[in-house]
């Protein structure tokens, strides 16, 4: 290596596409036997991932109360988990504790087995939805990585390793961006904007989800309506609407309307719309335990729901965020990544995460079920998601929050 200190990049990408029409041909329930969920290894780490998700969210929310937020805690935790395999001493401890693991309560073997099982479940074949995760390790072509690290990340985190010439920064960027673009089916492009020629490795993680509502909205009923960003700002957005059975209720504890919508497969989307002026309170109140309560209870009834079509995305610089969670050593000259390579000192210089959320009514099923003409008049309660709300995409099979976010302005992409 040309320098005494080699730099590493931790790059993450996530995509969630929630289409309210049918995106796949076979919508029948899978007959494949399921694992014993109660004894699943992934369930042992699920509470930690949920707490990590809300800890991350609160750090991001404190940075600004006027911006959209969207990220994949599973993607970020998976990348940190795989990176921890090559860390030692305080660098290692900080990552474990930063993600929320107490090593006196759960062993490292159980943690990595939990991630392994989580990834196996998320990547299993399912005709009802598209859910894919990927891990790529781009290694300087002159650097020799330890065999144990390569073996562990491959077996536990399904990582692929690629030889990369970082001195040719343009070609290296192209190689990494092509990997992410392909893995997210072209939805996330140009994740890497800048790359240092002294980089030693880039750890890239992505998650791609494309789901279909069990009960889709109808495209013909979408119309322009007001969305109240704040007391002084109103924007016009295409608002989907449907009369039907919805799991919807008002939660006094959160001062919020809570809407749960199931997607084909094992995904549930939870939307929480606080009363005006109560967003910050909800952000501080929402915990893993409260999320569990919301998921367990069913409030299905006949309602008319108006929900905005939207597509939001954003790139998060994770370095200051993770630093707030106590993960500092890995970014400093004191980093101990000697479990990755012994060729030269190594540290993570950059940690980027990009996630995209799309909610619309595209799809063949929505088109097939579209009824031309105006909606019938009804006395059913009407709820409009026309002000800022929170969103969580939850995988029921692994009990893990795949995505967490806040929609303040649906028109900001």
Swiss-Prot record:
PROSITE patterns: SERPIN. The record marks 377-378 as: Reactive bond. Keywords: Glycoprotein, Protease inhibitor, Secreted, Serine protease inhibitor, Signal. The reactive center loop (RCL) extends out from the body of the protein and directs binding to the target protease. The protease cleaves the serpin at the reactive site within the RCL, establishing a covalent linkage between the serpin reactive site and the active site of the protease. The resulting inactive serpin-protease complex is highly stable. Inhibitor of serine proteases. Belongs to the serpin family. This is Alpha-1-antitrypsin-like protein GS55-LT.
